[in-house]
Amino acid sequence: MEYFNVGKIVNTQGLQGEMRVLSVSDFAEERFKKGSQLALFDDKDQFVQEVTIVSHRKQKHFDIIKLKDMYHINAIEKYKGYTLKVSKANQGDLQEGEFYYHQIIGMAVYEKDRLIGYVKEILQPGANDVWVVKRQGKRDLLLPYIPPVVLNVDVPNKRVDVELMEGLDDED
């Protein structure tokens, strides 16, 4: 079965079995909602078990979750550093123009017909995502995911068309 990373358990939260998760999910509210089915993977990326979310809330930059049948700090401390993943079957359907992060990673980024590089990761610093583009012989380009910059995302052809605003590429 294919799984996709949605977050890392970075610490416990209180004594009642809550976990502090650093989310890397494109749809965190949906992914961590009550009843969601996720999989737990250890620090060697080995499957541990399926888990069910029983509660979720946001606190600062973290998602605080509680898992079914894990109601005390002693039951969850061993999971610090583990990864939460969603199975492909549990990802859900997307609306037109939506896509998952794992579909974007590795896509070729073009301005007109000039290859700029490839998306290597996606950051979530605030109001909008920032795509990190790996370039040949240059520093990585930080590309804000906003309409004037990202013109088209063609998932089947693994291509992103952009228009670099003045000052966005400091190496040109």
Swiss-Prot record:
Gene Ontology biological-process annotations: ribosomal small subunit biogenesis; rRNA processing
GO CC terms in record: cytoplasm; ribosome
Subcellular location: Cytoplasm
Main location: cytoplasm
Keyword Cytoplasm applies: yes
Keywords: Chaperone, Cytoplasm, Ribosome biogenesis, rRNA processing
The UniProt record lists the keyword Lipoprotein: no
Subunit structure: Binds ribosomal protein uS19.
Function: An accessory protein needed during the final step in the assembly of 30S ribosomal subunit, possibly for assembly of the head region. Essential for efficient processing of 16S rRNA. May be needed both before and after RbfA during the maturation of 16S rRNA. It has affinity for free ribosomal 30S subunits but not for 70S ribosomes.
Similarity field: Belongs to the RimM family.
Name of protein: Ribosome maturation factor RimM
Native organism: Streptococcus pyogenes serotype M28 (strain MGAS6180)
